[in-house]
Amino acid sequence: MKKLTALTSAVLLGLAVSSSASAQDTIALAVSTLDNPFFVTLKDGAQKKADELGYKLVVLDSQNDPAKELANIEDLTVRGAKILLINPTASEAVGNAVAIANRKHIPVITLDRGAAKGNVVSHIASDNIAGGKMAGDFIAQKLGDNAKVIQLEGIAGTSAARERGEGFKQAIDAHKFNVLASQPADFDRTKGLNVTENLLASKGDVQAIFAQNDEMALGALRAVKAANKKVLIVGFDGTDDGVKAVKSGKMAATIAQQPELIGSLGVVTADKILKGEKVEAKIPVDLKVISE
């Protein structure tokens, strides 16, 4: 009878869950993209904590596509996951995915990026507004007020891009920066390179670039080097590549997040919710400036 019960549970949960697991000990994670090392580290942090606490973690990659994200959430609810960790592709678009989970009474936790709509039990992220201001303050510390700056923005509609931009705007106002341009490069290294190439050619004397993530900053770095210019570059995330660029003197700084901790806290929070414990609606994760 016990063997029959275990087999039935496995069939209900699908191929992603082994016969030794049940729906009660399955946590699902939908990641915006696994092409970005930041989110790979976030996923690894979640996996490590899930292993430690004895949970099965099912991970799906949304490939920066809201439609794929929606399909992933539908898939995960069918698989029988009891709680969802979502790192949204975009804060507005993810509302449809959250609504699916809400209708099925599956608790949702958002990681790094928030959801503009739907019922989310807890949101775990860095203070992106504070981080954006930290980046601007660092530029002012190095170049003084009235610096000529460019901002490379992340994916439009994400809370991370909006909030980092809001924080940087506070620094712009405080230090009277001359903003030559602020354009999206979608958190992507190649787009960061291309956008920066165009702006360096059209905007002339650029003193500093704030990129809303390290991938764009590294793309900007290549463009600056190719143009044989001296420009102070500040990134955001504290990825391995970003930190290496800072320590080698190529980038001035990165505002370091803790993606592994964000993923880990997601699983810890899920564990508490599944046990019926109360959790905070917002769980902040500390930032720090890494410079040479």
UniProtKB/Swiss-Prot annotation:
Which Pfam families does this chain map to?
Peripla_BP_4
MF terms in GO? monosaccharide binding
Look up the domain of life of the source.
Answer: Bacteria
Lineage runs: Bacteria, Pseudomonadati, Pseudomonadota, Gammaproteobacteria, Pasteurellales
| Places the protein is found | Periplasm
Gene name of the encoded protein: rbsB
**In which broad location class does this protein mainly occur, judging by the first location in its UniProt entry?**
periplasm
UniProt keywords (A-Z) are: Periplasm, Signal, Sugar transport, Transport
Signal as UniProt keyword: yes
- Oligomeric state and partners? The complex is composed of an ATP-binding protein (RbsA), two transmembrane proteins (RbsC) and a solute-binding protein (RbsB).
- Stated role: Part of the ABC transporter complex RbsABC involved in ribose import. Binds ribose.
Name the protein family.
Answer: Belongs to the bacterial solute-binding protein 2 family.
Range of residues in the leader sequence = 1-23
Organism of this sequence: Haemophilus influenzae (strain ATCC 51907 / DSM 11121 / KW20 / Rd)
Which Gene3D superfamilies does this UniProt record tie to the protein? 3.40.50.2300
Gene Ontology annotations of biological process type: transmembrane transport
Q: State the name under which the record lists this protein.
A: Ribose import binding protein RbsB
InterPro entries assigned = Peripla_BP_I (IPR028082), SBP_2_dom (IPR025997)
